[in-house]
């Protein structure tokens, strides 16, 4: 519960930085009320998360707070990278992967490791369940990038092309810049240098370039690769097959989600 409260705090602040209108199909806190309310609500949720953490059995408090602090700092670092990348002309796939590992994947990794610590798992299993969380978390964010451009906004819960409007460097953008040639590359540069172009024009034009450069297919393959890495980590965990099946099911749901 502490991790979920912390996660929702990050979403409140993330929506402010992205100036997002919708979250899970509903108006964001800063849009419904204002930025100050959203900031203070997020701050309070951080404190509440720690209050929940210390209710754990005393023998586990120190190690789980260490894990919690590590991924909390990572999430903040990842968000800063995300904001920095918006003003950078080029971002490599390696830089982007590092950013989403920090911003998204470390949260899932840490949540699973906290559960393993409380379950008194051996160190090797704590490591492997963390690797599972990291890789499935990266796959989750890559899937999020796809859904932003290609998902149904009524199902996804966000406006289509929000990342495109904000000039965010997603895996689709990075691959498109690598693959595009001629007029497509020139148009892509122009689209990502403006913040004033009407979204109704910009979004479909950029998605057309994504289609022309086959980045959707490349991203789907990349997601599949991280999914397979996650499954490999599950196999290394020394627990009963029925318990592994729970993790496999979670991974499969993430892979097939549309929201």
What are these regions (language model features)?
Residues 1-259:
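All-alpha prenyltransferase/terpene-synthase fold signal
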């Amino acid at each position: 519960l502490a991790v979920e409260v912390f996660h929702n705090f990050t979403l409140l602040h993330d929506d402010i930085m992205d100036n997002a209108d919708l979250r899970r199909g509903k108006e964001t806190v800063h849009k419904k009320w204002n930025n100050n309310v959203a900031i203070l609500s997020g701050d309070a949720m951080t404190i509440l998360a720690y209050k929940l953490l210390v209710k754990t059995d005393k023998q586990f408090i120190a190690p789980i707070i260490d894990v919690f602090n590590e991924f909390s700092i990572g999430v903040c670092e990842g968000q800063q990278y995300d904001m920095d990348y918006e003003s950078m002309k080029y971002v490599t796939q390696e830089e982007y992967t590092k950013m989403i590992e920090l911003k998204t994947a470390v949260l899932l990794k840490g949540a699973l490791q906290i559960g393993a610590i409380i379950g008194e798992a051996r160190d090797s299993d704590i490591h492997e369940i963390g690797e599972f969380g990291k890789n499935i978390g990266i796959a989750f964010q890559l899937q999020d990038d796809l859904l932003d451009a290609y998902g149904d906004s009524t199902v996804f819960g966000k406006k289509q092309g929000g990342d495109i409007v904000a000039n965010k460097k997603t895996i689709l953008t990075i691959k498109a810049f690598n693959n595009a040639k001629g007029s497509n590359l020139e148009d892509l540069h122009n689209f990502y240098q403006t913040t004033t172009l009407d979204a109704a024009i910009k979004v479909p034009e950029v998605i057309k370039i994504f289609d022309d450069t086959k980045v959707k297919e490349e991203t789907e393959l990349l997601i599949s690769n991280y999914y397979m890495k996650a499954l490999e980590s599950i196999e290394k965990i020394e627990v009963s097959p029925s318990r592994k099946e729970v993790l496999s099911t979670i991974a499969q749901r993430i892979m097939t989600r549309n929201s």
